[in-house]
Structures are given as structure tokens and as C-alpha cells.
Amino acid sequence: MAFTWIRHHILGLEDWQPEEYQTLLQTASSFREVLSRRTKKVPALQGQVVTNLFFEPSTRTRSSFELAAKRLSADVLNFAPGSSSLTKGETILDTALTYVAMGTDIFVIRHQQSGVPDLIAGEMDRLESGVSILNAGDGQHEHPSQGLLDLFTICCLLDEENPRLELLEGKKIAIVGDILHSRVARSNIWSLTTAGAEVHLSAPPTLLPKYFGELCDRLFLHWDLEPALEKADFVMTLRLQKERMTANLLPSLREYHQSFGITRPRLQSCQPGVKVLHPGPVNRGVEISSDLMDDPDFSLISQQVTSGVAVRMALLYLIGNLRSDQ
């Protein structure tokens, strides 16, 4: 029986079912083919309005969502908080309602506080506006589109023609870095463990609290790097989010790199053909060495950026198409 997409908002991946991941992978694969054409545009969301509400700085995610919406022929509005009525005391909800009155169909929302996309989604549902919310990263909660594009990147490497969830069954994936503050880590934990992968988290104790081990099955914690990397199929390294650190959680960036930085020699204990991912932006020479980051034999960072457009097209299409059917 064919799976029917019914999810109106994309707020996080914690409750996603395997069928939803598979539908997303198949849809993103179709749009990846579209993006390989000379004419990279389709009329799937023609006449719909996508509004990017980004309350904290972003280059990759905002640009990727904007390009994805435009490739689907949607009209795109970009919100700039510094020049908005928020500086005059307007609330976030009132700002959103202003854009609803302009005809917004889908909000893409990033905010430094966890839960803001959920709050706006709840208000949209209460008002029966029909507007969908897509979380582009909220505080330390989740970053679902990043988790999905990482999943898609890995699956495409394993089978470019037919990326599917089952390809990750039994794979070992190490996630190294600032786990404590990372919404990317949380979304990847949900997606990768649902796919059947073993996820090994590694960081200094100050950046990897013990409670992470209670999130789900197939999740392992390491306060040393070596056991996390041993026989790993993929290594995902995360940026140290210094802007979110309110205490001295690390002696120095140099000492962090010496203990947890991903370098070519450290990958020798991984599986042959190991690949490295990073959600960006990258602190070269801190989370990962420059030579490794730029080596196409190891690094999937460029592929992650490319995959991001196809995955975000798929997300916008799935919720936008659901809206058009209502």
C-alpha cells in the first residue's frame, strides 16, 4: 500500500516514521535529477508564497531554502529582523500574522530559542490558517532539514540511483564535537538511529552530558575519540558553538583539536573508504584539518551543500502539495 504524506508541519524528526524518511529520500532523489538539468525549475509551488523568518544569522540554510523555493517556482519573502517592526516592539507572533495577511503559505523559521517554530505552528493551527511551518533550526532543539540532508547525502553515496533508509542498517556513524549545543546532532540522532545505524557520540565531558545516552537505542557515548572512530563508516564533526557557551567549557581551541580534531592519521582506525561530514560553517584546524576538509576522497561537505537544495525542495513540495490538496 502506497504511503500518503500527511505531515503539515516539519518541526523535528523525533517522531518521524521510516515511511516518512523513505518518502523524503525518494522525493529528494527526484529533485536532485531536476537540479542536474539545464533548466532547473519546475512549477510545483507556482502561486504559493514561502516566507523565510530567520531571527538569527544564517548563510547556508537561508540561501538553500530560498533557492529551493525558487526552483519550485514559489514566490519568496525574506524577513530581516534588524530592519523589521520587532525593533519597535512588535511580537514574533504579530510579525508572523502580518505575513499571513500578505498570503504566506509556508513559513521557514529559524530562531535562537528552542520552541519558537512550535509556538507559531500552534498559533497557525488555532487560527485554522492552513499555513505550514518548517523549522530551519531552533536553539538547541532540532534542525530537521540538516538531519535529512545528511541522511540523504550518506544514502546517495551508498546507492546513488536508489537512496533508501535500509542502506544504513548496521553502519557505524561517529558524531564528534559540541554535542551539548548542537541541534544538528539531535536531528541526526533521530534520523540515523531510525535507519538502523549505530551512532557514537564523542566529545569532552563538558560538551557531552550523560543524559544523551538515554535518548534512544543504538546510541553510544565516548569521552575519548578513539573508540568512537574505531571501524566507523562515517564521521560527522560539529562546530564548536562558542556563541552559545556561557561557561569555560574548554581549556582552549588548540587543546580541543589535539584531543578531538578530525585529522587524516586519526581516520586510520576507521573502515576503509570512511567519509567525513560537517554541517558548516567550519572552523578549519579546530574540528577538522584543512587538508582533510578539502580532500574529495574523504570529505562529503560539498555534497552536503548540494544535497541540501534537493532535500529542502522535497520538504517544501511535500507540505506545499498537501496544502494545495486541501
UniProtKB/Swiss-Prot annotation:
<dbReference type="InterPro" id="IPR006132">
    <property type="entry name" value="Asp/Orn_carbamoyltranf_P-bd"/>
</dbReference>
<dbReference type="GO" id="GO:0006207">
    <property type="term" value="P:'de novo' pyrimidine nucleobase biosynthetic process"/>
</dbReference>
<dbReference type="GO" id="GO:0016597">
    <property type="term" value="F:amino acid binding"/>
</dbReference>
<feature type="binding site">
    <location>
        <position position="110"/>
    </location>
    <ligand>
        <name>carbamoyl phosphate</name>
    </ligand>
</feature>
<feature type="binding site">
    <location>
        <position position="280"/>
    </location>
    <ligand>
        <name>carbamoyl phosphate</name>
    </ligand>
</feature>
<feature type="binding site">
    <location>
        <position position="239"/>
    </location>
    <ligand>
        <name>L-aspartate</name>
    </ligand>
</feature>
<comment type="pathway">
    <text>Pyrimidine metabolism; UMP biosynthesis via de novo pathway; (S)-dihydroorotate from bicarbonate: step 2/3.</text>
</comment>
<feature type="binding site">
    <location>
        <position position="143"/>
    </location>
    <ligand>
        <name>carbamoyl phosphate</name>
    </ligand>
</feature>
<feature type="binding site">
    <location>
        <position position="88"/>
    </location>
    <ligand>
        <name>L-aspartate</name>
    </ligand>
</feature>
<dbReference type="GO" id="GO:0044205">
    <property type="term" value="P:'de novo' UMP biosynthetic process"/>
</dbReference>
<feature type="binding site">
    <location>
        <position position="60"/>
    </location>
    <ligand>
        <name>carbamoyl phosphate</name>
    </ligand>
</feature>
<dbReference type="InterPro" id="IPR006130">
    <property type="entry name" value="Asp/Orn_carbamoylTrfase"/>
</dbReference>
<keyword id="KW-0808">Transferase</keyword>
<protein>
    <recommendedName>
        <fullName>Aspartate carbamoyltransferase catalytic subunit</fullName>
        <ecNumber>2.1.3.2</ecNumber>
    </recommendedName>
</protein>
<dbReference type="GO" id="GO:0006520">
    <property type="term" value="P:amino acid metabolic process"/>
</dbReference>
<dbReference type="Pfam" id="PF00185">
    <property type="entry name" value="OTCace"/>
</dbReference>
<feature type="binding site">
    <location>
        <position position="61"/>
    </location>
    <ligand>
        <name>carbamoyl phosphate</name>
    </ligand>
</feature>
<dbReference type="GO" id="GO:0004070">
    <property type="term" value="F:aspartate carbamoyltransferase activity"/>
</dbReference>
<comment type="subunit">
    <text>Heterododecamer (2C3:3R2) of six catalytic PyrB chains organized as two trimers (C3), and six regulatory PyrI chains organized as three dimers (R2).</text>
</comment>
<dbReference type="GO" id="GO:0005829">
    <property type="term" value="C:cytosol"/>
</dbReference>
<dbReference type="InterPro" id="IPR006131">
    <property type="entry name" value="Asp_carbamoyltransf_Asp/Orn-bd"/>
</dbReference>
<comment type="similarity">
    <text>Belongs to the aspartate/ornithine carbamoyltransferase superfamily. ATCase family.</text>
</comment>
<dbReference type="InterPro" id="IPR002082">
    <property type="entry name" value="Asp_carbamoyltransf"/>
</dbReference>
<comment type="function">
    <text>Catalyzes the condensation of carbamoyl phosphate and aspartate to form carbamoyl aspartate and inorganic phosphate, the committed step in the de novo pyrimidine nucleotide biosynthesis pathway.</text>
</comment>
<feature type="binding site">
    <location>
        <position position="183"/>
    </location>
    <ligand>
        <name>L-aspartate</name>
    </ligand>
</feature>
<feature type="binding site">
    <location>
        <position position="146"/>
    </location>
    <ligand>
        <name>carbamoyl phosphate</name>
    </ligand>
</feature>
<feature type="binding site">
    <location>
        <position position="281"/>
    </location>
    <ligand>
        <name>carbamoyl phosphate</name>
    </ligand>
</feature>
<dbReference type="Pfam" id="PF02729">
    <property type="entry name" value="OTCace_N"/>
</dbReference>
<dbReference type="InterPro" id="IPR036901">
    <property type="entry name" value="Asp/Orn_carbamoylTrfase_sf"/>
</dbReference>
<keyword id="KW-0665">Pyrimidine biosynthesis</keyword>
